[in-house]
Amino acid sequence: MRWFFFLLLSVIGLDRFTKQLAIIFLRDTGESITIIPGLFSLTYAENRGIAFGMEFLPPGVLLILTTIIVSGVIIYALYQGNRQPLFLGSFGLIAGGGIGNLIDRFTTGRVVDFLYFDLYRGELFGQWIALWPIFNIADSAITIGACMLIIFYGRIFPDSTASGGNNVC
């Protein structure tokens, strides 16, 4: 469980630290910092919605739903009994990222984003957006943790594949 809590707390700490830097050096100055021209920049944004900035739910409902999901992830990780490093790592990243964004939602009602890859612009669900959104460390941790669950499913949950069930979903 140390690995779970180490990653959870590390993600929260790194997320909070980098968001504060983004506020100071990007929001307060109104500047965007180009790292790789035409590809990657540090660009300040505040996101009231969920993935890709979509606002499907009222902020209060989104806050409650996010709290329930993050709590469920933590409870599942604590009581599941699986102590494999990949299990603890993936759920630690997901929980840490969820808490990092939840802190923003509780304190300001929106999530601070600042990492931007300019990969493609177009329409998604009828709304024009940069199809690669501006995101943050918490989002990255959630995505990496979820990808770990998919890629290493058989190693994280060996009992489910040993019984002949190859279905992930």
Curated annotation (Swiss-Prot):
The chain crosses the membrane at residues 56-76, 84-104, 132-152. Keywords: Aspartyl protease, Cell inner membrane, Cell membrane, Hydrolase, Membrane, Protease, Transmembrane, Transmembrane helix. GO terms for cellular component: plasma membrane. The active site is at D113, D139. Pathway: Protein modification; lipoprotein biosynthesis (signal peptide cleavage). Its main location: membrane. It catalyses: Release of signal peptides from bacterial membrane prolipoproteins. Hydrolyzes -Xaa-Yaa-Zaa-|-(S,diacylglyceryl)Cys-, in which Xaa is hydrophobic (preferably Leu), and Yaa (Ala or Ser) and Zaa (Gly or Ala) have small, neutral side chains. InterPro entries: Peptidase_A8 (IPR001872). GO terms for molecular function: aspartic-type endopeptidase activity. One of its GO terms (biological process) is proteolysis. It is an enzyme of class 3 (hydrolase). Signal peptide: none annotated. It is found in: Cell inner membrane. This protein specifically catalyzes the removal of signal peptides from prolipoproteins. Belongs to the peptidase A8 family. This is Lipoprotein signal peptidase. It comes from Chlorobium phaeovibrioides (strain DSM 265 / 1930).
